[in-house]
């Protein structure tokens, strides 16, 4: 026991044969003084109290009050070091986890940036190829792309066909393919100011309503300008030459007979049944496609 410990009543220091006790009010008594006072009452402050015998088996928290400062510093320094080491180990573990997570996220970000750059490069090349194809399609010499939303009568109104006979055209007909002049060539999907197109020459043919499903009748008659409409394409064929009004025997051919098709335009399928627009110079016919013919008859 420390040398500063003594009895608070008789002031005698502890020795081998004496025992000291501690009250909960903080006073120390030797056995002799403790026996002289009342039970459960402090001799100094007269307050109700409880006493604890000071020995090697006393609680460590109580023994700490009688230890030297150096011993207490060493004890608490050691405990503090253990606490610091424990906390530091867990901090390092948490820090290692976050570093690994950050490394994975940085790698994922790097891959994402690389993928975005590749996609942008592919997009740029595809846009270049698309622009090239678009420009090549828009500059085709035979035909033009018509907008799908425009109607057939509007396109027919914007196109004038010149089929008046001339010596030059007669010589061309005798040689083979016929030519028609279209006043107003294509502009913004419409036929605009002057386009000459070559078509297959089939003399003296007129297209009429098919009596048998899947077939169309082509008979000898006045020259006609035929527009064949299917769900995907608009086919323009020019049947010219010959004398007007002369009729001979009819000839039945399968639909889409083997005829040279000179000009193709994208077009939407015409609604309704067979529509015919006639002028003094030309007969324009809108037959349904083969699939619709089979359904209609």
Curated annotation (Swiss-Prot):
GO molecular-function terms, A-Z: SUMO transferase activity; zinc ion binding
Pathway membership, UniProt: Protein modification; protein sumoylation
InterPro entries hit by this protein: Zip3/RNF212-like, Znf_RING, Znf_RING_CS
Disease linkage: Spermatogenic failure 62: An autosomal recessive male infertility disorder characterized by non-obstructive azoospermia, due to complete metaphase arrest at the spermatocyte stage.
Keywords noted in UniProt: Chromosome, Coiled coil, Meiosis, Metal-binding, Nucleus, Transferase, Ubl conjugation pathway, Zinc, Zinc-finger
PANTHER family: E3 SUMO-PROTEIN LIGASE RNF212-RELATED, RING FINGER PROTEIN NARYA-RELATED
Zinc finger (RING-type) residue numbers: 7-46
Example of a GO biological process term: meiotic gene conversion
EC number: 2.3.2.-
Pfam families associated with the record: zf-RING_5
The protein, known as: Probable E3 SUMO-protein ligase RNF212
GO cellular component: synaptonemal complex
Coiled-coil features, chain-numbered ranges: 91-124
Biological source species: Homo sapiens (Human)
Function in brief: SUMO E3 ligase that acts as a regulator of crossing-over during meiosis: required to couple chromosome synapsis to the formation of crossover-specific recombination complexes. Localizes to recombination sites and stabilizes meiosis-specific recombination factors, such as MutS-gamma complex proteins (MSH4 and MSH5) and TEX11. May mediate sumoylation of target proteins MSH4 and/or MSH5, leading to enhance their binding to recombination sites.
Keyword Transferase annotated: yes
């Amino acid at each position: 026991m420390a040398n500063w410990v003594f009895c608070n009543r008789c002031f005698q220091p502890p020795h081998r044969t004496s025992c000291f006790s501690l009250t909960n009010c903080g006073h120390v008594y030797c056995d002799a003084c403790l026996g002289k006072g009342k039970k459960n009452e402090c001799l100094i402050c007269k307050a109700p109290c409880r006493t604890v015998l000071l020995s090697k088996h006393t609680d460590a928290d109580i023994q700490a009050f009688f230890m030297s400062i150096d011993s207490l510093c060493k004890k608490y320094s050691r405990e503090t070091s253990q606490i610091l080491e424990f906390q530091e180990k867990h901090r390092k573990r948490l820090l290692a986890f976050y570093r690994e997570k950050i490394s994975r996220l940085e790698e994922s970000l790097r891959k994402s940036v690389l993928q975005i750059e590749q996609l942008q490069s592919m997009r740029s090349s595809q846009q270049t190829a698309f622009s090239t194809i678009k420009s090549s399609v828009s500059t085709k010499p035979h035909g033009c792309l018509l907008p799908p939303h425009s109607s057939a009568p509007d396109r027919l109104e914007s196109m004038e066909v010149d089929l008046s006979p001339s010596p030059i055209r007669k010589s061309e007909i005798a040689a083979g393919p016929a030519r028609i002049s279209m006043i107003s060539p294509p502009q913004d999907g419409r036929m605009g100011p002057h386009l000459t197109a070559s078509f297959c020459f089939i003399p003296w043919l007129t297209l009429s309503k098919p009596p048998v499903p899947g077939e169309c009748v082509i008979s000898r008659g006045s020259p006609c300008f035929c527009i064949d409409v299917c769900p995907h394409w608009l086919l323009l064929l020019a049947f010219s030459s010959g004398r007007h009004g002369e009729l001979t025997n009819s000839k039945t051919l399968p639909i889409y007979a083997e005829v040279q098709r000179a000009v193709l335009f994208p077009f939407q399928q015409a609604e309704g049944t067979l529509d015919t627009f006639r002028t003094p110079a030309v007969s324009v016919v809108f037959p349904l496609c083969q699939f619709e013919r089979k359904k209609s008859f």
